[in-house]
Regions:
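Conserved acidic, metal-coordinating active-site core of Asp-based
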Residues: 95, 99-207, 211-216, 228
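Short acidic-hydrophobic, aromatic-tinged amphipathic segments that line or gate anion-handling sites
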Residues: 133, 240-243
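Active-site phosphate-binding/coordination module
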Residues: 19-119
Length: 252
């Protein structure tokens, strides 16, 4: 984009998406208006690239920080990718099996998991997505940028936090915990984007609702928390908007 005046980073679930995880026509129009005003819109999400392609097409947004900062896609190109080692995947897999949970593995092309349970189905129903294919050892031959422990809220969360201090865990919903490398976040994704593209002095705006948006707010000049946002995020916000189900982005 020539003569970029600002950059706006949008979380998806609970923010840009409506209550059924869809992009409304009003949001598509709002994104077009941002572009007309030389404001670059980017998605910043815990989801991965392959599962947000319909969202990107519907919204008109062609760049994204995905998997909580582990991967950056900018105008059709990969400009950053942080991958787990096979040994890290094996270790987490072993601990997850011991606790009776399942594990999902993410890269930009696909999602696969260790098994299907009621909790796994609930986790993906919660975000209106299909349950991933079962491929328990897919990490042996495929890249893994992010993992999810599929477990009920509060069910052994501390067990993982204590045993893997080198990782960061985000409990973003009642049925899953996002796992990224320590120090990686949506905020680090913003910094990596700016460093790679040589962007300096451009105002930044962050829109979000979840705990994983705290780092995004810290990395941007202005933070707009949705009305349905976590209280921790509202406390850090420059402005508090209405709920995502009340469709406020189109009025900005």
């Amino acid at each position: 984009m020539d003569k970029m005046k600002a950059i706006a980073f949008f979380d998806l679930d609970g923010t840009l998406l409506d209550g059924t995880s869809q992009i409304t026509p009003e949001i598509t129009a709002a994104v077009a208006a941002l572009k007309d005003n030389q404001i670059l819109p980017l998605i910043a999400t815990g989801r991965t690239l392959c599962e947000i392609q319909p969202i990107m097409k519907a919204s008109g947004i062609d760049s994204a920080i995905v998997m909580n900062g582990q991967f950056i896609h900018y105008e059709g190109k990969t400009i950053y990718s942080d991958e787990f080692t096979t040994e890290e995947c094996v270790s987490l897999h072993e601990h997850v099996k011991q606790r009776g949970h399942e594990l999902a593995f993410y890269n930009e092309r696909r999602i696969f998991c260790t098994g299907h349970t009621g909790t796994v189905k609930q986790a993906y129903d919660y975000i209106h997505s299909a349950v991933p294919e079962i491929d328990p050892t897919g990490y042996e031959n495929d890249a893994v940028n992010m993992m999810l422990v599929l477990s009920q809220h509060g069910d052994d969360d501390e067990y993982y936090y204590e045993r893997f201090p080198e990782l960061t865990f985000y409990r973003n919903g009642p049925f899953s915990i996002d796992i990224v490398r320590k120090g990686v976040s949506k905020g680090s994704g913003v910094k990596n984007l700016f460093n790679t593209l040589g962007l300096n002095g451009i105002p930044t705006y962050a829109f979000g609702d979840g705990i994983n948006d705290l780092a995004l707010f810290e990395a941007c000049d202005y933070g707009i928390a949705m009305g349905n946002a976590r209280e921790e995020l509202k406390e850090k916000a420059t402005f508090i908007s209405t709920k995502n189900t009340e469709r406020s982005e189109e009025r900005r």
